[in-house]
Amino acid sequence: MAGTSDTNWRSYVGPADNGKLVTSEDWQAPSNPREWDDLFKCSNVSNLTATGLVIPASREDSIDCVRGNAYSFQSCVIEGSVTVKGAIDGLKLYNCVVSGTVELGQYDNYWSKGRAPTRNVSLVNCCSPDGEPIRVKLWDAEMPTLQNTNVKLIKIPKWIWLPYFLFRRLTNPKAV
């Protein structure tokens, strides 16, 4: 939402949260998840692991990660969408149930022309709750590694996303 700040249930920010392990004992989802933009927000963190969480759907994303590296979500139930952006280098969804769309390389306030794409993402032993393929959208991102995971891959052509990103960059007062 350009011009407004997101309201996030839990935010993990580097370097303070580098190396953090978030378990089901640490995590309590809000009673009103649709009143929050993102429930599990990560910004510029290295080596963050979340395991055994149930993350409900919210107004925007269950999980929203921007910048950083070596994120790992293990044995989580993700009832909404996952957005991985900001040239993240390394994110793994392992043994997760994903209800929504996984978007890789979507626009973020730190985007600039020529920046490295989101890369080294893997989905391993993941599924959707209804057995249908998990929708994975590729924007400014490299192809994820897929292992024992049924996905419907939607590659957004660069001739679509690049003008959109340039427009967002030029009109975004929060662009860094």
State each model region's role.
Residues 1-7, 17-18, 44-54:
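Parallel beta-helix/beta-solenoid
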